[in-house]
Structures are given as C-alpha cells and as structure tokens.
Amino acid sequence: FYIYGEVQRPGAFRLSREMTVMQALATGGGTTARGTTKGLQIHRRDEIGRISVVEPRLSDHLQPNDVIFVRESLF
C-alpha cells in the first residue's frame, strides 16, 4: 500500500495480512500535527482499472495496492 498527505512517513509499505487502516496509519508514523483521521480517503483500483475513492473506517481492512490519503485538519 501507499500512504501520503499529512503523515509522518509518507511512502510505499508492505501490506501485512489483515492490516487495518489504523495499522497502516501507524506504519506511516501516524498523522502530522496538521493531519486528521477524519475524511481519510482510499484510492482503490478495480479489476478493469477504474479507480474508486472510498472513505474508510479505521477498522476497515486494506486491499493490495490501496493508496491512502490523509487530509489536513482545518482546525
């Protein structure tokens, strides 16, 4: 998976079996002081190559090649 935006260590990481969004955020070092877990987005490619945007819960499991975007908090 790949994680970018307001995280301490953006980049590509190995997806562990049954990894949740919360565990992925921890792998990326957590959010920055400006980041928020509200409004997270996962960009996910389907079998025919279309990309959909999913707003996950922290307990949702990742899929191979998911891209997580962490937004900046407005407050």
What are these regions (language model features)?
Residues 1-75:
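Ser/Thr/Pro/Gly-biased, low-complexity, turn-/loop-rich segments
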